[in-house]
């Protein structure tokens, strides 16, 4: 599964930004990919291990990430549970204010699996977070710090999660100013 088409469709239809706040899209800066990670001391070493743990006792596998039920990070967890052949409605998911809080909870052992994004996890890893990536949710391995992390697809889980990252401005900004920003960012 690939989330990028949904992100791009929303951009094309002008649906982006905080709900209820008029904003104007300026430019896409790049893509961020989903990441599945566990505590570095976890016995889980692969997606196969994670799927086996889910099948063995789903209630013991506590997922967590920034966002609420229905958010992108929650959907990643639900799709992993579905890949294990179980109903996502039985999973335990802890919502955090953001990825940083979720990664702190993972490091503290309060959740078992982080279903966030590579960019936020990279920052945490660089700061010494106690996490081990199991999979990146991209078509191909990512460069740099993630180059040795296999994709979910390499491990038999058909899950790709790309999020478009970009800039937008307030809805009250003039058309001329938006055009100047778009030209500068092109």
Please provide the spans of the model-predicted regions.
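Short amphipathic alpha-helical coupling segments at ligand-binding clamshell hinges
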Residues: 46-49, 174-185
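Small-residue transmembrane helix packing/gating motifs
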Residues: 159-171, 176-180
């Amino acid at each position: 599964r690939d989330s990028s088409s949904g992100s791009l469709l929303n951009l094309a239809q002008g649906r982006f930004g905080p709900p209820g706040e008029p904003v104007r899209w300026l430019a896409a800066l790049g893509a961020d990919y989903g990441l599945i990670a566990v505590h570095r001391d976890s016995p889980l070493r692969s997606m196969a291990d994670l799927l086996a743990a889910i099948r063995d006792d789903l209630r013991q596998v506590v997922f967590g990430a920034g966002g609420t039920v229905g958010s992108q990070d929650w959907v990643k967890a639900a799709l992993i549970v579905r890949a294990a052949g179980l109903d996502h409605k039985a999973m335990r998911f802890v919502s955090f204010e953001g990825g940083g809080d979720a990664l702190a909870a993972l490091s503290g052992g309060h959740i078992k699996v982080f279903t966030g994004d590579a960019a936020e996890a990279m920052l945490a890893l660089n700061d010494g977070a106690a996490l081990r990536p199991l999979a990146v949710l991209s078509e191909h391995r990512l460069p740099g710090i993630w180059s040795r992390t296999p994709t979910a697809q390499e491990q038999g889980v058909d899950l790709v999660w790309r999020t478009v990252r970009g800039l937008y401005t307030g809805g009250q900004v003039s058309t001329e100013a938006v055009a100047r920003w778009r030209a500068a960012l092109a």
